[in-house]
Amino acid sequence: MFIDTEASGLPKKWNVPYSQDDNWPHIVQLSWLICTKDGKEVKRQDYYINNNDFKSAASAIQIHGITEEFRQRRGKDRSTVMSILAADLLQYSPLIVGHFTELDLHMIGADFYRSGMENPALELPSFCTMMATTHYVRNPQMKYVRLGELYSTLFHRKLENQHNALADAKATADCFFELLKNGDITDAKIERQQAEMVKVKAEIKSAGYGIPVLIVFLLTV
């Protein structure tokens, strides 16, 4: 599964519980692709969230271009979207891949919390193309390479429609399979990164404590 989120802003702190709602931004667009191991796309999902319990920061809208009017008109209820994501996580038990996966895992973790749902992603392996491609960094002032820069390096063309979650999820998938093909990603490297993600998932589990227990979602696939 290749996943990307566009959000209402950035976290103020990374080590506080999701119950501190004003600390954690809200997802405004959530997209993911399900692919086979050889890169064949099985399905894609793309949703905007229209709940009125938050507003995006002007700086965030400037980046992703998702206005309040647009998401209210085009979006779905948060719980509906998170239920669809949870169903796919449970059905496919995928490797979850993102570019800056830590942020995406926190974003879906916070919105699972807001929806009163358990977070199936915490029980699944994950991989971050940003963490795996530090050797592609050309700017000595940068620690990681941005998705658009990685894409243009690998494919010698500009990534179009950046900061649209579906476009970025597809670009992450393209980069992952290209990196797999050229040997920059191997099964061993994916396995080694799981140890690095243990701390991230522990923080997410800690942040998500206190999920309301009276709300029970039955997901049948």
Where do the model's predicted regions map?
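Metal-dependent phosphoesterase core characteristic of DEDDh/y 3'-5' exonuclease domains
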Residues: 24-66, 87-212, 217
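Interfaces that engage single-stranded nucleic acids at replication/repair/recombination sites
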Residues: 221
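Metal-dependent phosphoesterase signature
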Residues: 61-84
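Entry/capping segment at the start of metal-dependent catalytic domains
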Residues: 1-40
